[in-house]
Amino acid sequence: IREELKRCSDLVQSITGKPTTLFRPPYGEYNDEVVRISREEGYECIQWNVDSLDWKNISAEDMVRRCTKNVNPGDIVLFHNDSKYILQALPQILEYYQRAGYRVIPISELLLEGETWIDHAGTQHLATPPPSASTGNESRKIEQ
């Protein structure tokens, strides 16, 4: 895990000139160990709660529908830069968000400050009071 984090971070920094502090576990799969190690290495594990399904090459219309239906403040929408219809769907999605009064912001502005913990659904919570029912092995696998 540490090696993969470092390799990816080094690559991003070599391209952008900026260090990374956030990462999305591949396929959304993670457990307490991944979160612990990422934090020890200075990273915050980020999940999403709205999947555009762009990776399945669904139509732009279906993507727009998925990303605008039941959207809420603080939602994180997953997109991929190589999806087939993202260039057609994204302007419509962003226009919808703007009309609905939402602002698209960097994830770094969504994160809670201070000690936090992440529940089984990938939602960040303040650590005070600390979670009382942690099993020590919380994990999540995204099912599509």
PLM regions and their residue ranges:
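Alpha-helical scaffold elements lining the catalytic groove of polysaccharide deacetylases
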Residues: I1-P19, E29-D75, I86-A89
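Residues at or immediately flanking beta-strands
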Residues: P19-L22, R103
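Active-site-proximal beta-strand/loop segments in catalytic clefts of secreted hydrolases
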Residues: R24-G28, W48-D51, F79-S83, I107-L110
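Periplasmic/luminal catalytic loop of GT-C fold multi-pass membrane glycosyltransferases
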Residues: V77-L78, Y97
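C-terminal domain-boundary segment and adjacent tail
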Residues: Y85-Q144
